[in-house]
């Protein structure tokens, strides 16, 4: 769907898209650095999330791993929800989740499905993680660091992550050529 975030693109793909869009528009378009991404995500907050700490109810704010992940438990040729009494149920509900929260969505959704942060940005936590143009080096770090890494940083977590893996400070490292199932990008 057009309103869905792009996923399964590598860092290299994202940077190439930014390069071509810059060329076409005459504007300098790129990915944010990790520091720029975190500043935009926090939107003036010093908490784990722009709306509170790790235990805040994210149901109306973000698309994270919640009780809707139980909907992955299906069976049959025409997949139907699996009854909790089914002996196989426990093997299909292994994904870690916050069962006390229901954000209403199982997988990634359009950008404006949840509330925007105070800067007007949507889905900074959850939905899909986002590439930054920063190398995965010691954190926190100085932007002028000489340290480098073969990995690039993705921030924000996704619909499959619990809050502790989607907080403002949470980072994930991937090779620049990796096309990760739950990672997309945001341009600046």
Language-model regions, residue ranges each:
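Functional-site microenvironments in short loops/helix caps that host divalent-cation chemistry
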Residues: 1-170, 181
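Short, positively biased Gly/Pro-containing turn/loop motifs at secondary-structure boundaries
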Residues: 173-176
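Short, structured beta-strand segments at or near domain termini in extracellular proteins/domains
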Residues: 181-188
